[in-house]
Amino acid sequence: MVISLRFTSYRTTIRLKSCHDEPNKFCNFAAKITFMRIARFTFNPFSENTYLLYDESMECVIIDPGMTDEDEDSILFGFIRDEKLRPVKVLNTHCHIDHILGNASSCNTFDIKLYAHEKELQMLERAGAASLMWNVPYRESPLPHHYIQEGEQIHFGNTVLDVLFTPGHAPGHVVFVQHQEKVILGGDVLFKGSVGRVDLPGCNATDLVSSIQHKLYTLADDYVVYPGHGPETTIGDEKKHNAFVRSDWSGL
């Protein structure tokens, strides 16, 4: 099993707060240096990407924890402790077995809650059977503390993630978008040169195409997609080159 770490540091943004200009008076400026960082870990036999997002507050969210055992736990948790981060939420883009294997250990270790879409509850409740079918160890996930919805905002530290409802690969699939940094945590909707599977229970090819064309492809070309499997890509590259869903036809 290959476990890899990818660390991306985004540009630094300077936010200025100024007083109103007044004649013959100096205007005071308060500058705040902010950043958002993404750490990517690849876990489990499915080579699933688990993401850790954090900013200068040192608060972080864990997205789709895929750790199967204590050895994989120690890689993610060791990074969190070494960086002195404070996890505040676990977020699931969807609840297929490869994306939830580390839900329990993450929530229990850091005493934090799970956030997912309500339409993924049935999948989460059937995860034990899925683990037997795929022959992977499973530590029972807690149920969601909060059901995520389209248009909602997820807050941690000084960072805001916008939620887009993107069904197709899973009935309650969502993606998380950070507009300031033009980043999409995309789960299994859109990959580099490919798209999420539509041959699993609850999948719908028409919905997947609609999610990509009407939710993701409407974002600017320079938005970076961090998918649930494989390398990152950009919206512009996929609109031009993805043979499964182009921006000007139905695909699939």
Region spans (language model):
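Ala/Thr-enriched low-complexity intrinsically disordered regions
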Residues: 8, 12-13, 30-34
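Conserved beta-strand hairpin/beta-sheet module of binuclear metal-dependent hydrolase folds
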Residues: 36-83, 175-186
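Residue-level marker for buried hydrophobic side chains located in beta-strands
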Residues: 61, 91, 114, 184-185, ...
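Active-site HxH/HxHxD metal-binding segment of metal-dependent hydrolases
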Residues: 67-73, 77-156, 240-248
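Metallo-beta-lactamase
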Residues: 67-68, 130, 159-252
